[in-house]
Swiss-Prot record:
Positions of the UVR domain: 625-660
Biological role: The UvrABC repair system catalyzes the recognition and processing of DNA lesions. A damage recognition complex composed of 2 UvrA and 2 UvrB subunits scans DNA for abnormalities. Upon binding of the UvrA(2)B(2) complex to a putative damaged site, the DNA wraps around one UvrB monomer. DNA wrap is dependent on ATP binding by UvrB and probably causes local melting of the DNA helix, facilitating insertion of UvrB beta-hairpin between the DNA strands. Then UvrB probes one DNA strand for the presence of a lesion.
GO CC field: cytoplasm; excinuclease repair complex
SUPFAM superfamilies from the UniProt entry: C-terminal UvrC-binding domain of UvrB (SSF46600), P-loop containing nucleoside triphosphate hydrolases (SSF52540)
Motif (Beta-hairpin): 94-117
Gene: uvrB
Domain notes: The beta-hairpin motif is involved in DNA binding.
Entry keyword S-adenosyl-L-methionine: no
Binding residue positions for ATP: G41, A42, T43, G44, T45, G46, K47, T48
Protein's name according to its UniProt entry: UvrABC system protein B
GO biological process, one term: nucleotide-excision repair
Organism, as annotated: Staphylococcus epidermidis (strain ATCC 35984 / DSM 28319 / BCRC 17069 / CCUG 31568 / BM 3577 / RP62A)
Domain of life: Bacteria
Length: 661
């Protein structure tokens, strides 16, 4: 039985500006059963706070989808703060590193699946699915991995092991049930997904918990006592009358179903081998027979095998080609989906299926997998649409899909800080570089910063060189710059080491810099992805964190995209100015703390204190290994503290260090 718990929003702020009307409109829309709604929220208007208020008012389990792990991590931290008493969960891919299995026919190279699984994220995924079966006050922040195949939710729910004080049950029966749901006995290395036995006491470490295990004490053939215990210290946290243990894997199957699944796999193998041999693909047939029989043997003996997800269509006894189960199936009938940065996230959801299919088809053609492996896949976009009932799209620049499916945009234009969208000035390209240098110098004199966006790498490089020769402290930000260096450049811009940054695509997250008072768009009239109306509005938004924010577009004609961006920005400015005037608000630049660059933590032998250090350019093998260990330690600590941004940056540093080694 799912427990009903109301959402309790904790915040020192009340909705202000146009947040109250946005909240009310979306809540009314959800209650009226509207399928599609769009929150058009300008940069810095508090969209997350509005989303939180909607969830509180509507009171439905909610799935929030973000387009990458970093963004999902930021949202998870924010929603945890807003809803400390409710179940806020995190569901992203549990791979720190993932190389899917693949085959390159031209070089006859098979690449084995190689992955580094993050145990903490695996625990959070289990916590998310089990929460949905226990309570209805659940918010799950997910990346697009939520549309990838997961086990059958009915099977997952039906296979739970329920223990209650006073229940008649032999100890051996509990152990057998735990093994059936893929827990393994380990009396020495006690960790998630294992249990240990000490006389009449069985201790179970649930897959969904981080530091708490369950101690079940027997008296004869009866459960005498159940307690929650800290697995490290042994300290008793609390007594329990009842506890539900969810399976240790989402791909869990009853024994009788496993037998049927194995028969189905054998039948498919037989048919596929005949096909391959008829086509005279003898090497492929031999390879497939060998690999599949090994997997079948593992399933018979262990109930599991490496890459078991490739047999998911058989394990769940679904017809070939049918829609896979995903996280979406773990929600009940009445729930809500919010898609953050929908103009980026929706195209990502749409594109997942085709990319996955192309890679798997090569493996099937060359005898590495059975054709049914195609059914272990992400959802097609049409299937995603079928499975979701009510959606709220959140974006500063909604895409064509949102515009087409939403009757009326819910606008949120006013910033709590009173900051306005920037003024836009269109200037001719003649003498544009000299004019640009003069504008930058003007900002330098006022201790302000500048972002310059160009269309090509060559233009960026040439412009950076020219500006350096003219005495301007400038750096160039491009896609080949590694994560750590990128963070350093942005920090140095804020600190004043640089006056300006030149780049091609400055829309990536992490470029919200309050010190930037001028954004310059070169070649604004060259139509294309980087100069579309949505891209221009996003770029203009980079100057909306400063009360002196201004945008200069250099162009010889005004394109439709430019006109739309200019008109939209002016419309928003007028709304913001009117609101500030009515309420006596003076716009104020955001004061954002400048963080030190994340760098390797080195322990000083004398003081044993942690200190920040720049990564040396050259290191011995031993120094590199020590640095890697320190960064790994710091990364895990950051993840534990829910500082996912920092953890992600440290992870990228690790990849760079390992690649260089």
């Amino acid at each position: 039985m799912v427990e009903h718990v109301p959402f309790k929003l904790k915040s020192e702020f009340e909705p202000q500006g146009d947040q109250p009307q946005a909240i009310q409109k979306i809540v009314d829309g959800v209650n009226e059963g509207k399928r599609h709604q769009t929150l058009l929220g300008a940069t810095g208007t508090g969209k997350t706070f509005t989303m939180s208020n909607v969830i509180k008012e509507v009171g439905k389990p909610t799935l929030i989808i973000a387009h990458n792990k970093t963004l999902a991590g930021q949202l998870y931290s924010e929603f945890k703060e807003f809803f400390p008493e409710n179940r806020v969960e995190y569901f992203v891919s549990y791979y720190d590193y993932y190389q899917p299995e693949a085959y390159v026919p031209s070089t006859d190279t098979f690449i084995e699946k190689d992955a580094s699984i993050n145990d903490e994220i695996d625990q959070l995924r289990h916590s998310a699915t089990s929460s949905l079966f226990e309570r209805d006050d659940v918010i799950i922040i997910a990346s697009v991995s939520c549309i990838y195949g997961l086990g059958n939710p009915e099977e997952y729910k039906n296979l739970v092991v329920s223990v209650r004080v006073g229940m008649e049950m032999e100890r051996s029966e509990l152990l057998r049930k735990l093994v059936d749901v893929q827990y393994s006995r380990n009396d020495i290395d006690f960790q998630r997904g294992t249990f240990r036995v000490r006389g009449d006491v069985v201790e179970i470490f649930p897959a969904s918990r981080e530091e708490m295990c369950i101690r079940v004490e027997f008296f004869g053939d009866e459960i005498d006592r159940i307690r929650e215990v800290n697995y490290l210290t042994g300290e008793v946290i609390r007594e329990r009358e009842h506890f539900t243990i969810f399976p240790a894997s989402h791909f869990v199957t009853r024994e009788e179903k496993m037998k049927v699944a194995i028969e189905r796999i054998e039948k498919e193998l037989e048919e596929r081998l005949k096909e391959l041999r008829d086509e005279n693909k003898l090497l492929e047939a031999q390879r497939l027979e060998q690999r599949t029989n090994y997997d079948l043997e593992m399933m018979r003996e262990m109930g599991f095998c490496s890459g078991i997800e490739n047999y998911s269509v058989h394990l769940t006894l679904r017809p070939l080609g049918s829609t896979p189960y995903t996280l979406l199936d773990y929600f009940g009938d009445d729930w809500l989906v919010m898609i953050d940065e929908s103009h980026v996230t929706l195209p990502q959801i749409r594109g997942m299926y085709n990319g996955d299919r192309a890679r798997k088809q090569v493996l099937i053609d060359h005898g590495f997998r059975l054709p049914s492996a195609l059914d272990n896949r992400p959802l097609k976009f049409e299937e995603f649409e079928e499975k979701t009932k009510q959606l709220v799209y959140v974006s500063a620049t909604p895409g064509p899909y949102e515009l087409e499916h939403t009757d009326e945009m819910v606008e949120q234009i006013i910033r709590p800080t009173g900051l306005l969208d920037p003024k836009i000035d269109v200037r001719p390209t003649e003498n544009q570089i000299d004019d640009l240098l003069s504008e930058i110098q003007d900002r330098v004199d006022k201790d302000e910063r500048v972002l310059v966006t160009t269309l090509t790498k060559k233009m960026s490089e040439d412009l950076t060189t020219y500006m350096k020769e003219a005495g301007i402290k400038v750096n160039y930000l491009h896609s080949e710059i590694k994560t750590l260096e990128r963070i350093e450049i942005i920090r140095d811009l804020r600190m004043g080491t640089y006056d300006a940054i030149v780049g091609i695509n400055l829309l990536r997250e992490g470029i919200d810099i309050p010190e930037v008072s001028l954004v310059v768009i070169l070649d604004a009239d060259k139509e294309g992805f980087l100069r579309s109306d949505r891209s221009l509005i996003q770029t203009i938004g980079r100057a909306a964190r400063n009360d002196k924010g201004e945008v200069i577009m250099y162009a010889d004609k005004i394109t439709d995209s430019m006109q739309y961006a200019i008109d939209e920005t002016q419309r928003r400015r007028e709304i913001q100015i009117a609101h500030n005037k009515e309420h006596g608000i003076t716009p104020k630049t955001i004061n954002k703390k400048i963080h030190d660059v994340i760098s390797a933590t080195v322990e000083s032998d004398e003081t044993n204190q942690q200190q920040q250090t720049e990564l040396p350019k050259k290191m011995t093998k031993k120094e590199r290994q020590k640095t890697i260990e320190n960064i790994e330690k710091e990364m895990k600590k950051a993840a534990k503290d829910l500082d996912f941004e920092k953890a992600t940056e440290l992870r990228d540093m690790l990849f760079e260090l390992k690649a260089e080694g």
